[in-house]
Amino acid sequence: QARMKAENLKNENELQSYFIHRMESILKEKGKKLIGWDEIIDGGLAPDATVMSWRGMEGGIKSAKAGHHVIMTPTEHCYIDLWQGEPSVEPDTYSMCRLKDSYSFNPVPDSVPAEMILGGQGNLWAESVPTFRHAEYMTWPRGWALAEVLWTGPSKTDWDRFWPRVERHFVRADQAQINYARSMYNAIVTPYYTEDGVLEIKLDSELGNLDIYYTFDNTDPDNFTPKYEAPLRIPKNATWLRIVTYRDNKPIGKVITLTIKELEKRADNTRHVVGNL
């Protein structure tokens, strides 16, 4: 508070900006350059700072337009410590970044001068990644997706051509005993409430050539149980939904088991988020 009063700073954001400006001047004296996470935007950027844009793309876009170099690393595409598939069958963490999300990353939006974007970066924070094998699982195949999109312009990326290459990399990873995630084969479960308040469940997958089978009767699903064709409504007295994916009449994804209460909770959370937009 004394420093804020002495420098006539109105709030903590301006205090942070004051600190960053001082740090930049010290670094310049040492022949170094300041790079900071995009919180350094708050309160005013130092003149020559480079911004690591992680809270989405907007901070990076704004900074690039203002003449600052930017490294794009938005959470929704680049945080590979997040779930990469159905949370109930993934290691515990706090949000979602699927393989397809990483592959859809374009670090150079059309609205900014390309020369101001230095590149992109994938981030694997280790708070919930206790072992090297776990780190491998979180890194691959999303690391391959980020490598391709960061080295290839968006005009040359193609999801339907990419994921078959991922499968070829799986063979190489098996030979090298590298631990990787097969989450792209698992079903995507999206519960929601219709306009008339009825819970429905949409099932999908990241790949376009998988069949999805399900049960509501507490038995394990296979290719002889009902095949998903359209959004599901929950039968009376059902307490569990079980789902599995098949390809060429062979199981390929994990069996996903969710209680109806969990589905209701997820649908409620989605409804609350949408309602607050």
Residue map of PLM features:
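Substrate-binding clefts and catalytic carboxylate motifs of secreted carbohydrate-active enzymes
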Residues: 82-198, 206-210
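Acidic/polar loop patches that form or flank catalytic/metal-binding clefts of enzymes
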Residues: 24, 28-38, 70-74, 153-159, ...
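Active-site beta-loop-alpha junctions enriched in small/polar residues
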Residues: 39-41, 54-56, 75-77, 123-127
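Hydrophobic, well-ordered secondary-structure elements that form the walls
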Residues: 27, 51, 143, 214, ...
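Active-site neighborhood of glycoside hydrolase catalytic domains
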Residues: 1-68
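Polar, glycine-rich mid-to-C-terminal structural blocks
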Residues: 19, 32, 47-50, 61-99
